[in-house]
Design a protein with these regions (language model features):
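N-terminal secretory signal peptides that target proteins for export/translocation
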Residues: 1-11
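Short N-terminal leader segment in a subset of presequences, especially plant chloroplast
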Residues: 9-13, 40-41
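Bacterial N-terminal signal peptides
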Residues: 15-25
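Extended N-terminal export/anchoring regions of large proteins
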Residues: 28-290
Length: 290
């Protein structure tokens, strides 16, 4: 009797469950409503919300952005404009040293400036850009170290570790190639970024060192003094004690952008007193809350 009663009770429960399911589906079908498959908004004037959780730690911040050797005619990404030539502004105050674009001449079709006083923006992108720099440029317009109403200067990311695996030392050979992209007449240039914070070292013949010290003397590059053409740096009487090919030169990797006199970059936006570089965050700031 117990077994029969238990089976009867179980059947009754199953019937109730099935009946409930049928009723639920029947009711749902009778009250069917079209629901938008697009994201729902409170109103047309209310911006959406976006949470950004980027992974931009080691080694992304300090790794090299433009891989491989330098190839004339290839375009490289970075804070510099590949379609512009630059001069270097030297000042006794290191924070006031930077590259700035010139209105003329413009690079040729292979991004070469071919001028003993000019640097190719495309070459500087290849030489000095860390992976985080294009990311910052795309998101915010770049890392501003000078940000006044009329002047904007961007600075490369900090290269804090001595590690050639993340940012290899670079070498470019050939006086013709170098003369087209640097303010130099050397026949070879070796470049170091790793461990130098916001700076770059260049030399023709010296070892760039395994830590923060090179194997030879280091000079703060001043274009009005240093021609980078094999000329003499130090003399004793008529005797030249050191040529510029046997020295290391230090440059600060900063660049002036959105200079209307030299031509604006594509991401420059007009403000009341000048132009500023913007990225996706500024572009969509009126439509999205971050």
């Amino acid at each position: 009797m117990k077994t029969s009663g238990s089976q009867s009770t179980l059947k009754d429960r199953l019937l109730l469950v099935v009946a409930g399911i049928v009723i639920a589906f029947t009711g749902a079908a009778g009250a069917e409503v079209d629901v938008s498959q697009s994201p729902l908004f409170v109103g047309s004037n209310v911006p959406g919300n976006l949470a950004l959780v980027p992974s931009v730690e080691f080694p992304t911040v300090i790794s090299v952005a433009n891989l491989g050797g330098f190839t004339t005619g290839s375009r490289y990404v970075g804070y510099f404009n590949s379609a512009k030539c630059y001069k270097y502004n030297y000042d006794a105050d290191e924070t006031k040293r930077y590259f700035y674009p010139v209105a003329s001449p413009a690079p040729d079709a292979s991004f070469r400036c071919n001028d003993a006083t000019l640097w190719s923006g495309n070459f500087l992108n290849w030489a000095a850009t860390q992976t985080i720099d294009p990311f910052r440029s795309a998101m915010t317009g770049g890392y501003r170290v000078v940000d006044t109403p009329t002047t904007t200067i961007l600075e490369k990311a900090v290269g804090e570790r001595v590690n050639t695996g993340n940012f290899p030392r670079r070498t470019v050979t050939g006086s013709t190639v170098i003369a087209g992209v640097m303010a130099s007449k050397w026949n070879k240039v070796m470049i170091r970024i790793d461990g130098l914070q916001n700076k770059m070292w260049i030399t023709q013949d010296l070892d760039l060192g395994g830590n923060t010290n090179a194997t030879g003397p280091r000079y703060e590059y001043n274009p009005s003094v240093h021609a980078l053409d094999g000329s003499c740096l130090e003399r004793t009487g008529r005797q030249c004690d050191r040529y510029d090919t046997d020295a290391v030169f230090e440059l600060s990797v900063r660049v002036k952008v959105c200079d209307n006199a030299a031509g604006l970059e594509d991401n420059c936006v007009k403000y009341s007193q000048g132009y500023k570089p913007e990225g996706l965050i500024q572009e969509y700031s009126q439509r999205i809350k971050y």
